[in-house]
């Protein structure tokens, strides 16, 4: 009986500390080479304004590739980019909307991928 109660107690503790982080991307589509796209990532379940946020991507049949990141405003809000996208992609954030953006210009066929935001 004690064993069963211990498990119930443990489950109650775990349930109490659950935190559901949600990152929902939108804005993808089909564009011709040279075109532009803007992706959005709506965040919830954590303090977005304090978080450093990144974009990664996965091309068909390939592994994950880091695209870039933006620091929190308190840490300067600066951005860094992977060499293949530098000068073409821009990451920004709107802390009032808990939203991260990826503006992609001068798109190339090699930019074809599934894009994910991460923290």
Curated annotation (Swiss-Prot):
A GO cellular-component term linked to this record: immunoglobulin complex
Region span, Complementarity-determining-3: 118-119
Residue stretches spanning the membrane: none
Keyword presence, Membrane: yes
InterPro entries: Ig-like_dom, Ig-like_dom_sf, Ig-like_fold, Ig_V-set, IgHV
A Pfam family this chain is assigned to: V-set
This protein's record includes keyword Lyase: no
Region Framework-3: start-end pairs: 80-117
Signal peptide start-end: 1-19
Disulphide bond pairs: 41-117
Protein name: Immunoglobulin heavy variable 3-15
């Amino acid at each position: 009986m004690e064993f069963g109660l211990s498990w119930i107690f443990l489950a109650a503790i775990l349930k109490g500390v659950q935190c559901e982080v949600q990152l929902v991307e939108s804005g993808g589509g089909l564009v011709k080479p040279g075109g532009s796209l803007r992706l959005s990532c709506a965040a919830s379940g954590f303090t977005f304004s304090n978080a450093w946020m990144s974009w990664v991507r996965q091309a068909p049949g390939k592994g994950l590739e880091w695209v870039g990141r933006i620091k929190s405003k308190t840490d300067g809000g600066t951005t860094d980019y992977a060499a293949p996208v530098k000068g073409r992609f821009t990451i920004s954030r709107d802390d009032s909307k808990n939203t991260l953006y990826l503006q992609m210009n001068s798109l190339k066929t090699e930019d074809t991928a599934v894009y994910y935001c991460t923290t």
